[in-house]
C-alpha cells in the first residue's frame, strides 16, 4: 500500500461531493417551492381577509444560492399574521412569514417586484 497522495483521486472525490451537494440542493429547492405553493393555498383558504401571498428569497430567486437548510420566505398582504404563523408551523421547512405592510418601503417594493405571487384574491 502506497502512502502517496493521489491528487486526481482527491479531485474526483471532491467533484463528486460537490455535485451531490448541488443535486440535493436543487431537489430541496423544488420541494420547498411546492411546499410554499401549498402553504399559500392553505393560507388563502383559511383566511378570507388575506389578499396576496408572495414567495421570495433563495427558494424563488435562481440568482441566490440555495442550501439544503434554506428556509421558505413568505410575505402576506391582508389577513391575520398570527394565524399565518400558526398555519405554517407544521411545515417540514422553516418558514418565515412577514406582513408586507409592516416592511420597510424598499423591502416591500422589492418583494412586490421580484417575489413570486403564490396566491391572490
Positions of the model-derived regions?
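Catalytic core of pol beta-like nucleotidyltransferases
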Residues: 1-54, 60-68, 77-121
